[in-house]
């Protein structure tokens, strides 16, 4: 209902994709776009975005090995109240693939995935949630730096 309401009112859409496969959200974006246009809004003003968990490092294996325990601990904290089984490395590794919801790894990997999401959904916005699991401040600052200096130029320049 919130997708329809936002579209009818001409409001922007931001979808949190924090698990599973992003492609499963495609019908929401299609519904929003159709309803937005059918409601008479200007296509040039349509804004759609994705919010996703992200974390970057210079080396994929190193950042993944360091970040996984923190991320898993947070997912387990959330999952306990929801009856989820413990978060596994397989889930994390799948999440990092093109078909998964995580944007974790080297800058080129993250940029490629943002471009894939943009092209798949017609995105105009992307929000990276980088502090999931409470990484060390220096690691978080490095992730933000890499996002700004390495990912953004690729995404904006495309």
Identify what each model region corresponds to.
Residues 23-124, 156-158:
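An alpha-helical appendage that flanks or caps ligand/catalytic pockets
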Residues 1-22, 29:
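A conserved active-site cap/scaffold subdomain adjacent to cofactor or substrate pockets
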Residues 14-16, 49-51, 127-129:
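A cross-family glycoside hydrolase active-site/sugar-binding cleft signature
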Residues 1-3, 57-59, 135-137:
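Short catalytic/ligand-binding loop motif for oxyanion handling, primarily in non-cytosolic enzymes
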